[in-house]
UniProtKB/Swiss-Prot annotation:
One of its GO terms (biological process) is regulation of root development. It comes from the Eukaryota. It comes from Arabidopsis thaliana. GO terms for cellular component: mitochondrion. This is Protein NONRESPONDING TO OXYLIPINS 2, mitochondrial. Keywords: Mitochondrion, Plant defense, Transit peptide. Induction: Accumulates in cotyledons and roots after treatments with isoxaben (an herbicide) and 9-hydroxyoctadecatrienoic acid (9-HOT). Induced in leaves inoculated with Pseudomonas syringae pv tomato (Pst). It is found in: Mitochondrion. Expressed in cotyledons, roots and flowers.
Length: 93
């Protein structure tokens, strides 16, 4: 699962990086002649965005561990909770 997220995020990140590095050709607006500073469109450097990509494997590993620890299979092939999270809320289950 983590490798799937990693393999999907690499092409998306490289496409995003190439889109951010393309020079944009825009005609000068009237506000640039008046002296009004342009509004910052996207102020995060690419280095900070790269750290978001490194968190994807951690997120999928934590989500997988939580799912595995909450659902277990006992010897009678019925669902049970390994850590007893819902046993106190639903005593009849």
């Amino acid at each position: 699962m983590a490798s799937r997220c990693r393999s999907l995020s690499k092409p998306a990140f490289s496409a995003f990086r190439s889109a951010m590095n393309k020079p944009s050709i825009r005609p000068k607006s009237a506000s640039s002649f008046i002296g009004v500073p342009p509004s910052p469109g996207f102020s995060r450097p690419i280095g900070q965005l790269g750290s978001l990509q490194s968190l994807l494997p951690l997120y999928s590993a934590v989500a997988s561990a939580r799912l595995t620890s909450c659902l277990g299979i006992d010897s009678q092939n019925s669902r049970s909770l390994a850590q007893g999270m819902l046993c106190s809320a639903n005593p009849g289950v």
